Amino acid sequence: MKASELRSKDAAELGQELESLLKAQFGLRMQKATQQLANTSQLRNVRRDIARVRTLLTEKAGK
């Protein structure tokens, strides 16, 4: 997800997005542990999306 898409959302929507990304990350980690995950780059992408959302939440909290 692009940062420009995330910037248009408010804090509540970002919180929901963060929750869904954390659930997705957990599912991907479980798939990796059981060796069912073929595309391991998905983990990296989700982790970076989580960082983007958390950064924007921090920015919005400071304003």
Curated annotation (Swiss-Prot):
GO terms for molecular function: structural constituent of ribosome. The keyword Ribonucleoprotein applies. The keyword Ribosomal protein applies. GO terms for biological process: translation. Keywords: Ribonucleoprotein, Ribosomal protein. One of its GO terms (cellular component) is cytosolic large ribosomal subunit. Pfam families: Ribosomal_L29. Belongs to the universal ribosomal protein uL29 family. PANTHER family: 60S RIBOSOMAL PROTEIN L35/50S RIBOSOMAL PROTEIN L29, LARGE RIBOSOMAL SUBUNIT PROTEIN UL29C. NCBIfam families: L29. This is Large ribosomal subunit protein uL29. It comes from Bordetella petrii (strain ATCC BAA-461 / DSM 12804 / CCUG 43448). The lineage of its organism: Bacteria, Pseudomonadati, Pseudomonadota, Betaproteobacteria, Burkholderiales.
